[in-house]
């Protein structure tokens, strides 16, 4: 049937900030949905708090609200549209992850949808409840003849204890209505049960947890299914987890299609999946169902389902070429599967199930190095921050490609230090899942362990272990062969080995380039295959490619000739990680769309299945490949060959994808690849402290005093000369990796030992640390003759907090005109001094009216999307055009940039935008189960960001906090404990809170200072102080854990008892999910936000309205 005529206006809820467990896959899903709905003639309103997303670009919806995703704010949007006579007919919440689903449930429960006559489409309220509520779902599984793990839903700790007594330990604890396994875990002891179930009851919006028998070690599978209003069902993809049950599927290596299922098991799963889908009532959309199989007896149970588009849906979409989110959106508005045409073949309908003639492997990317002390054990709580995907003609080829796609410094096995230990020690280690288990499996086999021993120890299916065993045998062949001949080299490449891996085993070839030269001499090159959804049964019309090394030398590539248009290759940013997230993907997508419009053929290279850049119709051609020198160069050659007789590849863009492509620029240029925009030598100049310092000296721009050290003695002399505190860091890092503020010589010695291990080929930088300075961030464009300031941002936290973790405001709220003019002059001098062509980000610190240059990055920064949303200027699009020859003057004429002026000086009526970082501290614990410290510093720790935008700073800040962490309290109790240096600065913010009616708790020293300043407060004991006569009975931590505190203000002390006390206070605040402010500036901003909330005048406005006002 055609689309429903009664639907004219649809509200789409996005997923908000990038979190562990809910990442960029929902930007990909939501972007697809918005495009489809608008193409169908529907009016679309979107709400999403994440400015780094493509979906929040104003062109993807009629009304785009960058607002917190809460029931309160969504209702404000619905009400505003209704007041304007523009009633919203339907709410589509199945494409925004768990956040959107939970918000939709609240809007149903509080009556808002009924009040405004808004229908839930995709999955209705009852379907969401049946799919998400553990007990209801278990009942459905039983009804359709399936089996669940023995379990019980518990609402109290007493019920939890009774259930554990019945089931026996170990048990799995799973909260309802959470994502990424938040709050879940394997409990081996009564103490584990108390902690995990307590956390789970707190994490679950419905305050219940499922206590389940342990199925640890079973094999895990997933099915992606879709159903339409006529009860047509398709199984889009089967996915098998390499890791057994007990490891969250988001942290497991996964493989599609499933490799080790028997046909009978698959058919049983398929039948059960379809019956469950029908019974739950997801009648217009997609869902994901997880199963477990006992490898000993074949017992099959159903674990859970997601009645929405999920992380696995994005993976399945990229793995098969079947656009699940796009089709789900069409099904939600009334179409049936047989009416929807497959985009890739342009002739088969969507009711044709995809067929794969290749293997897909996804691997997680972890960031444990960012959280010292965090337990690296993989459990049912997801901990990975990103993922990479690869395609190959066999499992082992795809595995090799995905391992080098993760960008951990290795190119697969044998390209880093071997794991430690004897065969018995490695087998013992394999009983516990960690992020290094692939390397442990290979090493155990290499040391002589049998496939069966490794499979038993790790719980990994013997078939997968056997495949890695084939690589161990191949390694021995490569080492032992007297000469590396064509047959062995071709077989090595067919099995996924990179040139770097082969070079590591054949020293006589003198490195990766030696292997490359040998390959070229022997005529061994990859062929490029096509993802077509139908195993070549029908012709693919969409060029979506992956590489493979065939054993047959006559195998042909499938890259179609295209000689008419000049080609531009865009290097993406690879897997998301802390320091390099979707902000960079945003810039790559903008480059692809704007350059296609400008007449170029755009070619995207990336390996991240979550992103919009790897959608098959973002660029003219897509290569799903690792971002390594070897892989990129082969694509360049393939594209040059396909463009023979025409202009060919005129440029490769490395400036937009973060540090990953920048790291390849120099080698690619030396290999003859044309790099456009800022040249590699200019990129190196900006990174080299000595050369960059010379640029600043010539321009008369001050920078903090610094020195370079390769030993502790050198570092000690430099630190003594410039004075403590100092900021120490290795060079060439993104996200502040390895950075630390050091206050004394003892700490410096420990740091130098660690840092030189981190980056032995580069010296350690020792900078004077500017305490209490205001940090400023600038994004600018330069075409070689003119500089255009995109935006000037003022950081809310002082210098010393990584810019990616600091909240910032645009326009700046305390800088004067003379400060901004100084920023402009400095930015122009730096842009011309380096030789920037494209984007430039500069960070400054303003202290005692002196503007210091901290660093300059001649590339797209993570703030580009935020600045673009706040100012209505598409910086990434302008950058792409400038790199390919356009001038700023030309872009002004075309209306891409403002005809006069730029973003340095904003209009008086310009709204204030606040960007806030989202931090994942609640995801990580130490091995003993205690929280890790939530203190911020120069090393970046945030996974994502939100934006609040309003007429004044207080309202914008309040929105940003609500979007990131939940509403600031309007009343209640605030606990204050601050370092001596901060006490004077905090008098006014705390007095204002007291005046607003807040009860103030404080520790002894802080309480004394507050009372002297006329602020009433109650005293609590420090956590490390034993209770004795004369001390308050309740400690600060006790008060927080008892639920008596609504906000914490705690700035760090030195390294003694109070420092430990501060850690305990902050950890307690994180565990209780209450706001915890760790800087003076943050406290002042929070007070302004609280005042705005109490005033009650925080409204909503769409970006379209805001941008229209900016242009008028």
Curated annotation (Swiss-Prot):
Residues 1-407 are annotated as: Carboxyphosphate synthetic domain. Disulfide bonds: none annotated. Mn(2+) 4 binds at residues 855, 857. GO terms for molecular function: ATP binding; carbamoyl-phosphate synthase (ammonia) activity; carbamoyl-phosphate synthase (glutamine-hydrolyzing) activity; metal ion binding. The keyword Mitochondrion does not apply. Keywords: Amino-acid biosynthesis, Arginine biosynthesis, ATP-binding, Ligase, Magnesium, Manganese, Metal-binding, Nucleotide-binding, Pyrimidine biosynthesis, Repeat. Residues 138-333, 693-884 form the ATP-grasp domain. Residues 408-559 are annotated as: Oligomerization domain. The keyword Phosphoprotein does not apply. This is Carbamoyl phosphate synthase large chain. Mn(2+) 2 binds at residues 304, 306. Mg(2+) 2 binds at residues 304, 306. It catalyses: hydrogencarbonate + L-glutamine + 2 ATP + H2O = carbamoyl phosphate + L-glutamate + 2 ADP + phosphate + 2 H(+). Belongs to the CarB family. GO terms for cellular component: cytoplasm. Binds 4 Mg(2+) or Mn(2+) ions per subunit. Pfam families: CPSase_L_D2, CPSase_L_D3, MGS. InterPro entries: ATP-grasp, ATP_grasp_subdomain_1, CarbamoylP_synth_lsu, CarbamoylP_synth_lsu_oligo, CarbamoylP_synth_lsu_oligo_sf, CbamoylP_synth_lsu-like_ATP-bd, CbamoylP_synth_lsu_CPSase_dom, MGS-like_dom. Residues 966-1112 are annotated as: Allosteric domain. Its EC number is 6.3.4.16, 6.3.5.5.
């Amino acid at each position: 049937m055609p689309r429903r005529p009664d639907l004219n206006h649809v509200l789409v809820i996005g997923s908000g900030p990038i979190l562990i467990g809910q990442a960029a896959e929902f930007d990909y899903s939501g972007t697809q949905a918005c495009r489809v709905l608008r193409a169908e003639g529907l009016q679309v309103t979107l709400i999403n708090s994440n400015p780094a997303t493509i979906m929040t670009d104003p062109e993807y919806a009629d009304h785009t609200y960058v607002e917190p995703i809460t029931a309160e704010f969504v209702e404000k949007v619905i009400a505003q549209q209704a007041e304007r006579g523009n009633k919203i007919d339907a709410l589509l919440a199945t494409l925004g992850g768990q956040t959107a689903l939970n918000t939709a449930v609240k809007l149903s429960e509080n009556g808002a949808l009924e009040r405004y006559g808004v229908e839930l489409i995709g999955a209705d309220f009852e379907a969401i409840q049946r799919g998400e509520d553990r007990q209801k779902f278990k009942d459905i599984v039983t009804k359709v003849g399936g089996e669940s793990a023995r379990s019980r839903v518990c609402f109290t700790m007493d019920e939890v204890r009774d259930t554990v007594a019945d089931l026996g330990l170990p048990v799995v604890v799973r909260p309802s209505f959470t994502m990424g396994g938040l709050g879940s875990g394997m409990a081996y002891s009564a103490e584990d049960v108390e902690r995990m179930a307590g956390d789970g009851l707190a994490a679950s919006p419905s305050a219940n947890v499922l206590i389940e028998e342990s199925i640890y070690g079973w094999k895990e599978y997933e099915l992606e299914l879709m159903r339409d209003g006529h009860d047509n069902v398709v199984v889009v993809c089967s996915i098998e987890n390499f890791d057994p049950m007990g490891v969250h599927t988001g942290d497991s290596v996964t493989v599609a299609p499933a490799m080790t299922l028997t046909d009978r098991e698959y058919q049983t799963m398929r039948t059960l999946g379809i019956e469950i889908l029908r019974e739950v009532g997801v009648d217009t959309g997609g869902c994901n169902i997880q199963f477990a199989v006992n490898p000993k007896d074949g017992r099959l149970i159903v674990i859970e389902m997601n009645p929405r588009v999920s992380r696995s849906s994005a993976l399945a979409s990229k793995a098969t070429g079947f656009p699940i989110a796009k089709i789900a959106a069409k099904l939600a508005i009334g179409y049936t599967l047989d009416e929807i045409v497959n985009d890739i073949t342009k002739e088969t309908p969507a009711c044709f199930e995809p067929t794969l003639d290749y293997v897909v492997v996804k691997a997680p990317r972890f960031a444990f190095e960012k959280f010292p002390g965090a337990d690296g054990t993989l459990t049912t709580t997801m901990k990975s921050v990103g993922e990479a995907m690869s395609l190959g003609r066999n499992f082992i080829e795809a595995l090799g490609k995905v391992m080098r796609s993760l960008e951990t410094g290795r190119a697969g096995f044998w390209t880093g230090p071997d794991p430690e230990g004897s065969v018995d020690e490695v087998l013992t280690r394999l009983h516990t899942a960690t992020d290094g288990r692939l390397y442990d499996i290979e090493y155990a086999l290499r040391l002589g362990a049998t496939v069966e021993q490794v499979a038993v120890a790790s719980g990994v299916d013997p078939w997968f272990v056997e495949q890695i065993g084939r690589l161990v045998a191949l390694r021995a062949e490569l080492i032992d062969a007297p000469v590396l001949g064509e047959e062995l080299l071709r077989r090595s490449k067919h099995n996924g080995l990179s040139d770097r891996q082969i070079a590591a085993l054949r020293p006589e070839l003198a490195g990766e380039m030696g292997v490359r030269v040998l390959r070229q001499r022997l005529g061994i090159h990859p062929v490029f295959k096509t993802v077509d959804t139908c195993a070549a049964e029908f012709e693919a019309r969409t060029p979506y490619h992956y590489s493979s090394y065939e054993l047959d030398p006559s195998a042909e590539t499938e890259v179609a000739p295209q000689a008419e248009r000049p080609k531009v290759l865009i290097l993406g940013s690879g897997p998301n990680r802390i320091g390099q997230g979707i902000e960079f993907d945003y810039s790559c997508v903008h480059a692809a769309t704007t350059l296609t419009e400008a007449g170029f053929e755009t070619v995207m290279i990336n390996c991240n299945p979550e992103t919009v850049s790897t959608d098959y119709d973002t660029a003219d051609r897509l290569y799903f490949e690792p971002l390594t020198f070897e892989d990129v160069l082969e694509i360049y050659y393939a594209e040059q060959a396909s463009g023979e007789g025409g202009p060919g590849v005129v440029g490769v863009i490395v400036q937009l994808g973060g540090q990953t492509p920048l790291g390849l620029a120099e080698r690619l240029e030396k290999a003859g690849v044309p790099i456009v925009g800022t040249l590699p030598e200019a990129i190196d100049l900006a990174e080299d402290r000595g050369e960059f310092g010379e640029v600043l000296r010539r321009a008369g721009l001050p920078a903090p005093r610094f020195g370079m050290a390769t030993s502790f003695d050198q570092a000690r002399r430099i630190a003594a000369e410039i004075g403590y505190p100092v900021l120490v860091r290795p060079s060439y890092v993104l996200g502040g990796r390895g950075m630390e503020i050091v206050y004394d010589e003892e700490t410096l010695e420990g740091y130098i030992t660690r840092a030189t291990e981190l980056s032995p080929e580069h010296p350690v930088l020792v900078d004077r640390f500017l305490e209490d300075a205001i940090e400023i961030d600038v994004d600018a464009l330069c075409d070689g003759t003119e500089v255009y300031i995109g935006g000037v941002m003022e950081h809310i936290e002082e210098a010393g907090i990584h810019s990616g973790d600091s909240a910032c405001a645009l326009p700046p709220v305390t800088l004067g005109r003379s400060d901004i003019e100084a920023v402009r002059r400095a930015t122009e001098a730096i842009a011309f001094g380096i030789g920037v062509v494209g984007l430039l980000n500069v960070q400054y610190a303003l202290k005692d009216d002196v503007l210091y240059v901290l660093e300059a990055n001649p590339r797209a920064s993570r703030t580009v999307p935020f600045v673009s949303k706040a100012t209505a200027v598409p910086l990434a699009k302008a950058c792409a055009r400038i790199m390919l020859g356009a001038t700023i003057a030309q872009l002004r004429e075309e209306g891409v940039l403002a005809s006069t002026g730029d973003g340095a000086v904003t209009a008086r009526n310009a709204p204030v935008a606040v960007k806030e970082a989202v931090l994942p501290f609640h995801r990580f614990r130490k091995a003993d189960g205690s929280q890790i410290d939530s203190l911020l510093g120069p090393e970046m720790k945030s996974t994502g960001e939100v934006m609040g935008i309003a007429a004044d700073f207080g309202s914008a800040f309040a929105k940003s906090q609500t979007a990131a962490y939940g509403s600031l309290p309007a009343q209640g109790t605030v606990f204050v404990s601050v370092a001596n240096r901060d006490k004077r600065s905090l008098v006014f913010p705390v007095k204002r809170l007291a005046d607003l009616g807040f009860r103030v708790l404080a520790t002894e020293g802080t309480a004394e200072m507050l009372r002297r300043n006329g602020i009433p407060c109650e005293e609590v004991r420090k956590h490390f102080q034993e209770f004795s006569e004369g001390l308050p009975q309740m400690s600060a931590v006790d008060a927080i854990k008892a639920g008596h505190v609504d906000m914490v203000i705690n700035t760090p002390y030195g390294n003694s008892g109070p420092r430990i006390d501060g850690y305990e206070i902050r950890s307690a605040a994180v565990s209780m999910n209450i706001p915890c402010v760790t800087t003076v500036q943050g406290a002042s901003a929070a007070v302004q936000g609280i005042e705005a909330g109490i005033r009650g005048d925080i409204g909503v406005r769409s970006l379209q309205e805001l941008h229209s006002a900016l242009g008028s």
